[in-house]
Amino acid sequence: MATAVRAVGCLPVLCSGTAGHLLGRQCSLNTLPAASILAWKSVLGNGHLSSLGTRDTHPYASLSRALQTQCCISSPSHLMSQQYRPYSFFTKLTADELWKGALAETGAGAKKGRGKRTKKKKRKDLNRGQIIGEGRYGFLWPGLNVPLMKNGAVQTIAQRSKEEQEKVEADMIQQREEWDRKKKMKVKRERGWSGNSWGGISLGPPDPGPCGETYEDFDTRILEVRNVFTMTAKEGRKKSIRVLVAVGNGKGAAGFSIGKATDRMDAFRKAKNRAVHHLHYIERYEDHTIFHDISLRFKRTHIKMKKQPKGYGLRCHRAIITICRLIGIKDMYAKVSGSINMLSLTQGLFRGLSRQETHQQLADKKGLHVVEIREECGPLPIVVASPRGPLRKDPEPEDEVPDVKLDWEDVKTAQGMKRSVWSNLKRAAT
C-alpha cells in the first residue's frame, strides 16, 4: 500500500499535459482505499488513456506494473467507483422554489388559467414533526433530540433499534396526514350582511402578541373583500386579495385596517392583527350614543349622524351599524350620501367620531353650564357639565337666523311630506 501511495505521489512527474490533468480528476491523492486502487488498475490498464496514443504510455505502463506487482489487495467484485458531488443543482434552490416546480406554479400561463388544468396538488409542510437531530438512522444526540441529563447522569450518544425508528417515522407521517385532514374540514361560518358575501362576518379576536398579551375581549368584523390586480413583467395580471376589517371591544376602543395577500385567509390574518395596533378611543354619552350631531365630508362621501335617546337603535348604513356595535354605540341615526366607497366611509366615520366634543370640553371652552332638555322632564333643564374654571356671566349670543345647512329630504320628513316604507321596521339585535 505504501508503494502504491508513493507511486501515485509521483503522478505529477510521470504524467504531463492533458493526461496528468485527466488522472488528477479521476482520483483523490489524499487517501487510496481498495476500491480506488482497483479503479486505478482499470484506468491504467485498458481504459480511458488508450486514446492518448502510444507515444507517452511508457510511464503509465510502469505505474500500472508497480500497482499490480507490489499491491496485493483483495476486494469484492461487486464494488464500483462512483462519482459523488455534495453540491448539486437542488441544493441551490429553496423549499418554496422546489414546491413551485413540483406543483407547476411557476408558469405564467398557469397563473392566468391557460391550458388544461388537472386536479390541483396541495403543498405539504415537510418540516412538521421534524426535530433537530432526528435522522433516518435513529441516532440519539443528547441536547438535540433527547434530554441532556437523565436520572442525574449525562446521556451518551446512542442509536434506536430498527423497530423504534420505524415507529417514529410512522408517527411523523401520521401527524402530517392528520394536519392535512384538519385543514380540509369546513367550519360553518356566521352569516353576515347577506348569504353570499363576506361583509359582517366575525373573524374572532386578534392573535396573541409576541409578549403574551391577549385580546379576548375584542371582536373582528369583515367590512369588505375585494380582488385587486397588478401588472407584472413575469406573470402578467397578478391577482391578490384586499380585506378591510374593523375591531372593537364594545367599550369605546375600536380600529380598522387593511390586509393584502394572495391567499384570502392570510389577508384576514394580516388585517385583524394589524387593526388592533391602530385603535381609536371613541367617547360615548352614557355609554349608548354620541355627544352631539355630526356632519362631515370625507373625499366624496357625506355622513350625517344624529344623537338619539335610549331604545332608538341603530338606523344607519350596514357598515356603520357593524362599526357602531364594535365601538359600543347602541342608539344613533346616520345617513350616507355621495360615494359609498367602503374605505372612505370607514375613514370618515372614525374621523368624525374621534373628533366629537364632549360636554365637559364644551363647558370649559364656553365657560358656561351645559344643560340638556328632555321630553320626559318637561321644561326643567338638566345640567350635564360645568366649567372647571371661572363661570362666565354673559350668556351665549343667539343669532336671529341660525347658520345651519338644511337637507331638503330632512325638511320633507319633518313636515310629514315623506314617509319611508322602512320607517316602522325594527332591526333584530345581534
From Swiss-Prot:
The keyword Transferase does not apply. Keywords: Mitochondrion, Ribonucleoprotein, Ribosomal protein. It is found in: Mitochondrion. It holds the Pfam family Ribosomal_S5. Its main location: mitochondrion. Residues 218-282 form the S5 DRBM domain. SUPFAM superfamilies: dsRNA-binding domain-like, Ribosomal protein S5 domain 2-like. GO terms for biological process: mitochondrial translation; translation. It comes from the Eukaryota. InterPro entries: Ribosomal_Su5_D2-typ_SF, Ribosomal_uS5, Ribosomal_uS5_C, Ribosomal_uS5_N, Ribosomal_uS5_N_CS, Ribosomal_uS5m_N, Ribsml_uS5_D2-typ_fold_subgr. Component of the mitochondrial small ribosomal subunit (mt-SSU). Mature mammalian 55S mitochondrial ribosomes consist of a small (28S) and a large (39S) subunit. The 28S small subunit contains a 12S ribosomal RNA (12S mt-rRNA) and 30 different proteins. The 39S large subunit contains a 16S rRNA (16S mt-rRNA), a copy of mitochondrial valine transfer RNA (mt-tRNA(Val)), which plays an integral structural role, and 52 different proteins. Belongs to the universal ribosomal protein uS5 family. This is Small ribosomal subunit protein uS5m. The gene is MRPS5.
